[in-house]
Amino acid sequence: MEAAMNNHDGDCCKSGPGYATPLLAMSGPREKLIYVAAIYTGTGQAKPDYLATVDVEPSSSTYSSVIHRLPMPYLEDELHHSGWNSCSSCYGDSSCERRYLILPSLLSGRIYVIDTKTNPREPSLHKFVDPAEVLEKTGLAYPHQPHCLASGDVLVSCLGDEDGNAEGSGFLLLDSEFNIKGRWEKDGNSPLYGYDFWYQPRHKTMISTSWGAPAAFTKGFDLKDVSDGLYGKHLHVYSWPQGELKQILDLGDTGLLPLEVRFLHEPDKATGFAGCALSSTLVRFFKNDDETWSHEVAISVEPLKVENWILPEMPGLITDFLISLDDRFLYCSNWLHGDIRQYNIEDPKTPVLTGQIHVGGLVQKGSLVLALGEEGKAFQFDVPKIKGQRLRGGPQMFQLSLDGKRLYVTNSLFSVWDRQFYPELVEKGSHMLQIDVDTDKGGLSINPNFFVDFGTEPDGPSLAHEMRYPGGDCTSDIWV
């Protein structure tokens, strides 16, 4: 991955960062390092969040361990998602390089810029964008998802105003030096709610999703807040790069809390998916002949009838998904049920389940919660121990190797929600797993030799969230 970062990766070494096509990216070098956002915010420990560097090179003496920790200079940040200053969208520009990891803090509003180029094994803080300046110039707060643009600018979704109102959501545009340029969207074209976004330049479109009002989700999840309209069920279709809101797709009850959104990687394709957490659906969106966009439910995870839980039925809660670089497979996490699913999406209209594995969840054997079968017979899922450790929480964030053969998994969603649904996760910390993927016939299996225990960190148990490779990946790089 260091070779990729330095643009010495075979076919991609003659131009800008990344790869010319998604398929060329699949032939990139195997990952050796992975950066993980690690969180102390909300755990009761007065320690700063940090960026953990994990060794994922099997031949290394420090394989499957944290080899470096970069603490942030402030407390109570809540690191969450991340992105790059430049990626494959800048492939045609030799003046660009993938050097800085952009780390927004969901609660404090600080946007950290991390230098990963000087020493990839020991990243350092380059600067941070002051939330007071962002607020003064744009009115935006709660920064969430950054994406690099072909222009060299960085676009960051923001989820509300300083009071946590969703009406204040929008998109922050930073220049290549991380100075504030302003809002990206045109005046009066802000989304109803904010969260994730993905753009497909050949179709002159960006689509963004809807978590909810920060004033609601930062207090924990309350089902009443959904009925009170404090959570989203919409996809926002923008003209790219003009920033005009062209359409709002109302997903209804089959699309509650749409979080992650991904177009297919092939830039000519005018379709993609959004993962809707509460409805536990993958909604496919697609362009019509008249240039408008429509949607349909492509995947639906049925709720479990349960005993000894807060509700009689438990949703899967799809909190993350990703798509392999060849657009063959989609992987999604059911954070509450505890399983990871692999679908063949060669025909995006009709995904086929090809793999499933349980790596935690509220219904694993030994837990208090029981699932009920069709005839009312109680059951629980078998979840293996890894290196003698019982798996805590449920599968949450993913990262897939470039070749599609290794899926990395962490288990923290958001510290307040972790404490609400998985208190043991806050007490004992997260862990990181690696799933081996059969890319021929389909199928998933746990790598028993890989287990990173964030419960044994020097400053106490921490929560592990999003992951990034130094050389880019299938959830950061966009092809133009």
UniProtKB/Swiss-Prot annotation:
Keywords: Selenium. It comes from the Eukaryota. The keyword Acetylation does not apply. GO terms for molecular function: selenium binding. Expressed in young seedlings, mostly in roots. Selenite binds at C12, C13. Induction: Slightly induced in roots by cadmium. Belongs to the selenium-binding protein family. This is Selenium-binding protein 3.
